[in-house]
């Protein structure tokens, strides 16, 4: 599966449709405590960085599964959105256009 963030690729392709994947991740109380401390002293909150990277990877895998089900061999126009659903949860959504690259 070829993944592209651009909306158009130079190869000939057939558009198969929208594909998406999402992952909702809850924060761990231990991470919240460490995040609070980091908020005071500054610096990267590695636990949250790892959590969001894992969520992005899972969401991407789910999008790829949807594309495979349509018979796609590529996805173009990929975009990621991250949002907070509740006080202790984050959602990562990824979406793009499934395509069958012909050449």
Swiss-Prot record:
Alphabetical list of InterPro entries matching this protein: UPF0145_dom_sf, UPF0145_YbjQ-like
Superkingdom in the source lineage: Bacteria
Family the entry assigns: Belongs to the UPF0145 family.
Name this polypeptide is given: UPF0145 protein HH_1800
UniProt organism field: Helicobacter hepaticus (strain ATCC 51449 / 3B1)
